[in-house]
Amino acid sequence: MLSKFYYCKMRKGKSPSSFFSLHKKYLLTGVTILSFIFMFQYKYHEVLTVYEDKTNVQQSSRLFWTRLLFGRTRSRITGRIFNIEIPHSSRLYVYNFFIKYLNINKEEIKYPIESYKSLGDFFSRYIREDTRPIGDLNEYSIVSPCDSEIVDFGELTSNYLDNVKGIKFNIKTFLGSDMIKKYNDDSTSFYYAIFYLSPKKYHHFHAPFNFKYKIRRHISGEVFPVFQGMFKIINNLFDINERVILSGEWKGGHVYYAAISAYNVGNIKIVNDEDLLTNNLRTQLSYMGGDINTKIYDHYKDLEIGDEVGEFKVGSSIIVIFENKKNFKWNVKPNQQISVGERIGGVDQPKQPQNKFIKIRS
């Protein structure tokens, strides 16, 4: 049998020695590549050790392999592809495919779909304001900041969130600073809500109540996917991913509004903040010892409920941490699909306005 194998190989013009030489070459190449990968893994573990593993990752090796699969460079490449201009004659076919595939409501899109020059423009499209009414104007109520699935919500009772769904993060690490002390320990509590925007959703995010902010923090990090399964692979995922945090105040007390990057593009934009650049090349990530970029404005930035705050180029997550009265109640269920402007909780009965809708920049 073996002689027949050699005979067939030699008939094709290859001697047994050249056959084995070729396979030896492939083997050496594979061993070299694996050696480099394991060397980088070892060095990566060293870096985390030097910087005391600020995110308390359970396994640095698991984080390394996840970076290999979902690295920032891959997201930047995707971003460039998404920004390639599509010929006008092809746009209807391309966008209608995604509308059908992702089950996007075409009637809500503000502008004709052929006006979007690229996939990036299409996925960050605007919707008609009149399709998203504000559901509650009570001063201690909160509405959804985005079209999303509300993944989790509740009261913060410590500086570390660890829930049954596997979502874990250190509040201090996540915010890049200590939380400010409550206005009144006896009458208020801190609450949180986590929103996930899938690729099919409207990608702009809005103010969930009237608030003002003076501090913007940009914490560089990874752009790992933020779907539910990733929380089982990487603990403290939100402490690792890149994020932008607005720190300010509202009627109920202090508020932290966080926009978190995710895989495929990783870009976050904040309205009227031209200095903000996310997912930059050759950036030392904050959890590996890089600096946190903090911008303190001369004056407060005031936002009314429903005002546009910013946008993602592809879906990601929003986390709102806010102080409110102790008798605050939620009006939603975990994993519920909600629209921007829809009431998710409050102190009093909803105060539904007439003809009050979200606002966009255009």
Curated annotation (Swiss-Prot):
TM region(s), chain numbering: 26-44
Membrane topology: Single-pass membrane protein
Names of the cofactor(s): pyruvate
UniProt-annotated site: Cleavage (non-hydrolytic), residues: G315, S316
Keyword field contains Glycoprotein: no
Example GO biological process: protein autoprocessing
Activity-pH dependence: Optimum pH is 6.8.
PTM info: Is synthesized initially as an inactive proenzyme. Formation of the active enzyme involves a self-maturation process in which the active site pyruvoyl group is generated from an internal serine residue via an autocatalytic post-translational modification. Two non-identical subunits are generated from the proenzyme in this reaction, and the pyruvate is formed at the N-terminus of the alpha chain, which is derived from the carboxyl end of the proenzyme.
Keyword Transmembrane helix recorded: yes
Active-site residues from the entry: D147, H206, S316
Compartment(s) of residence: Endoplasmic reticulum membrane
Keywords: Decarboxylase, Endoplasmic reticulum, Lipid biosynthesis, Lipid metabolism, Lyase, Membrane, Phospholipid biosynthesis, Phospholipid metabolism, Pyruvate, Transmembrane, Transmembrane helix, Zymogen
The reaction(s) this protein catalyses: a 1,2-diacyl-sn-glycero-3-phospho-L-serine + H(+) = a 1,2-diacyl-sn-glycero-3-phosphoethanolamine + CO2
This protein's GO CC annotations: endoplasmic reticulum membrane; mitochondrion
GO MF terms held by the record: phosphatidylserine decarboxylase activity
Note describing how the cofactor binds: Binds 1 pyruvoyl group covalently per subunit.
Modified residues (Pyruvic acid (Ser)): S316
Pathway note: Phospholipid metabolism; phosphatidylethanolamine biosynthesis; phosphatidylethanolamine from CDP-diacylglycerol: step 2/2
Function: Catalyzes the formation of phosphatidylethanolamine (PtdEtn) from phosphatidylserine (PtdSer). Plays a central role in phospholipid metabolism and in the interorganelle trafficking of phosphatidylserine.
Quaternary structure annotation from Swiss-Prot or TrEMBL: Heterodimer of a large membrane-associated beta subunit and a small pyruvoyl-containing alpha subunit.
PANTHER family from the UniProt entry: PHOSPHATIDYLSERINE DECARBOXYLASE, PHOSPHATIDYLSERINE DECARBOXYLASE PROENZYME, MITOCHONDRIAL
Family: Belongs to the phosphatidylserine decarboxylase family. PSD-B subfamily. Eukaryotic type I sub-subfamily.
Protein name per UniProt: Phosphatidylserine decarboxylase proenzyme
